[in-house]
Amino acid sequence: MRRTLVLTVFTALAPALLAAQAPIPPADQQIAVAVLPLPAEFRADATVLGYSPEGKLVTLRDGKGAMTCLADDPKEEKAFHVACYHKSMEPFMARGRALRASGVTGDKVDSVRFKEVKAGKIRMPKQAALWSLSGDASVVDMAAGKVTPAARALYVVYMPYATPATSGIPAAPVRGAPWVMYPGTPKAHIMFVPSM
């Protein structure tokens, strides 16, 4: 009886739950917005990963350029985030996505990846760039393929194992200046935030 009641309630609510999820934008809209963090010269040739109508991460466009862009996740309805990174970072980035999809969270994602880098399972580039735009959902107009000036830009140059001593860049954030985040780790990178 209880099982029948649960099944009946779920069946009755399923259409409402599905309708409550934000629709997944068409591929062309996802692509147009995903490449916005990049300088214009890199946009047309970037590979773009985005979401199928079923919500699965797929390759929306297989580009010939050096950059890979990740479209905004439609499951994150209140937030907006797109990022583009050099293709040499894909093994590291893909592993992070796989770990999160399997339920690994927080610092554990990096601890697993760091061990795998040290074991030679993930190869890190000598240096690689990442460009991103973030904000709340109001900063993007998917249909128009635009973001508002309220979208926050972030620029990163990955330099695995870099430290203040090896780079001449401080580890503490400084307004208007670069700093090294995660110094001494495989994920070490120079942060450039246009405004803090």
Where are these regions (language model features)?
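Positively charged n-region of N-terminal signal peptides that target proteins for export
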Residues: 1-4
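Bacterial N-terminal signal peptides
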Residues: 6-16
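Primary mode marks residue(s) on the alpha4-beta5-alpha5 output face of response regulator receiver
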Residues: 22-196
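Sec/Tat signal peptide C-region and signal peptidase I cleavage site
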Residues: 16-22
